[in-house]
Amino acid sequence: MNDEGDLLQENTRDEGNETEASRMSKLRRTRKKVTKQHIFSTEVGEMDVSNSKERIRSQMVCHTLGNMSKPVVGPGSADSHLPQDDKDSENQTTVIKPSPLKTSASAPCSEFNTNSNHADNTWEDTQIPTTPHLSSRMKHIKQEMAKNHLQFVRFEATDLHGVSRSKSIPAHFFQEKVIHGVCMPRGYLELIPNPKDDEVDHIRATCFNSDIVLMPELSTFRVLPWAERTARVICDTFTVTGEPLLTSPRYIAKRQLSQLQDSGFSLLSAFIYDFCIFAVPEIINSKTISFPASTLLNNHDQPFIQELVDGLYHTGANVESFSSSTRPGQMEICFLPEFGISSADNAFTLRTGVKEVARKYNYIASFFIETGFCNSGILSHSLWDVDGKKNMFCSSSGIEELTITGKKWLAGLLKHSAALSCLMAPAVSCRKRYSKESKDLKESVPTTWGYNDNSCAFNIKCHGEKGTRIENKLGSATANPYLVLAATVAAGLDGLQSSDGVLASPGDSTDLYPSKPSEIPLKLEDALVALEEDQCLRQALGETFIRYFVAMKKYDLENEETDAERNKFLEYFI
């Protein structure tokens, strides 16, 4: 690993005069340069970072500002004792790289063997310099808290399943916790399958008993209309030494978006979710016949739908449309596209919000798939220039066709579809839909794509006011939205960097050439193998995360039968 603080990303792109060809050429260059300066850049200026305490202070200030397009990433990791074949550090494209405060190199896991006093001391001694941007944001938040007579603020973070894990803080302690963070046991988010499991020996079992720190991104502060006198703020997770948690799905997504930005692009995306509304003890509208988008079903319980949509709007998650879906009690909700991490934040907000609103009406809202049909989780996305002014998928010819950039992006998605399916359909039950049209017993099915074809895994839409976009339909609603976003960007970027794999024109074969046709494994076990063997995704998402994810899923498979009773209750949480 390089010396602390010695790595900074240099942004050398000329945003105004890039052609598509120059973008392709640029993507093949080395995207990391080494400098010898200890400079910490923020939107309010630069400061010299000269010691460990200053570096932690700098990291916390930039993070608190809530700059979602430029995530805070440290050069080290929570697992710095690992052999340095871990690609996390080698492939980070970051704006800020404050050096972590390290413990003795002779104690590989010593940074985890901490108690709450250690955690408090680490952050307590750090005084946050006040910036105009931070002061303005805090002033606005204080006004909101007073206006709404808030009593509590939830500090929320996502676990591997996309489930919100949080601690509620009395409102009068909010500013203090913004500065010092909120401690939470690491095992709450990483969900260790078994403390004695040798497959996760890259993270020692004792590490799961240590604290991590939830640091709020203030731009995500929202009053929750469905929770009495309560607000929430989405947090990023750090070790007590100020290093990002490498298994954090939101951190992984922000890192991939940073890679995309450094390559001269931005992502406009939105999630489309199916979820089920249950009454007690049966499904609402539980008829054997299905009427998708039926007006009567759309308005079956108007107060519930109105409160949900209005509540999501006030949390910043703009619902574009909703309707009944293909199964009894199943609803579809579509979000308005947004740039950056916001689309995943909106999906994360929905996953908790819909359950809280449903509970007020004595319903259960669930994304979990157990009854034999699928709740889908589609990521509709398009690639834009870094300024968000030009759709890089949209052909100027006026015909239904992707640009070369779009074709390369799609080629990357197809190339990595087997590994992508592992992250996007992470349970046995949600992989059944891959073979629903096939009567033959197969190990895999071809990955399909097409124009305006909703039966394909990747559906290209060129119509409508949104412009050309690709719907990634591999996902189920149980997948973590941050991982879906991160993996899609990683695969697409690899397609842009590749010199082959250009798609045929619409009139020719829909296969890739010269690459071999891609396949989606039907069994989760085979998908896990594909993920382990996919060097691109291993490098992009990080060795630490991949090894942990695979270990946890293997544990789930081994205990699938014994967990059947436990799974009956997952609909309350997933």
Curated annotation (Swiss-Prot):
Residue ranges annotated for the GS catalytic domain, each copy included: 249-574
SUPFAM superfamilies, sorted: Glutamine synthetase, N-terminal domain (SSF54368), Glutamine synthetase/guanido kinase (SSF55931)
Annotated InterPro entries: Gln_synt_N (IPR008147), Gln_synt_N_sf (IPR036651), Gln_synth/guanido_kin_cat_dom (IPR014746), Gln_synth_cat_dom (IPR008146)
Gene3D superfamilies to which the protein is assigned, alphabetical: Glutamine synthetase, N-terminal domain, Glutamine synthetase/guanido kinase, catalytic domain
UniProt region (Disordered), positions on chain: 1-36, 66-131
One GO CC annotation: cytoplasm
One Pfam family, short name: Gln-synt_C
Annotated coiled-coil segments of the chain: none
Ranges of Polar residues composition bias in the record: 91-131
Compositional bias (Basic residues): 25-36
Domain (GS beta-grasp) ranges: 148-242
Function, as annotated: May act as a component of the cytoskeleton or as a chaperone for the reorganization of intermediate filament proteins during terminal differentiation in the lens. Does not seem to have enzymatic activity.
PANTHER family per record: GLUTAMINE SYNTHETASE, LENGSIN
Subunit organization: Dodecamer. Interacts with BFSP2 and VIM.
Protein name: Lengsin
Organism, as annotated: Canis lupus familiaris
Gene (UniProt): LGSN
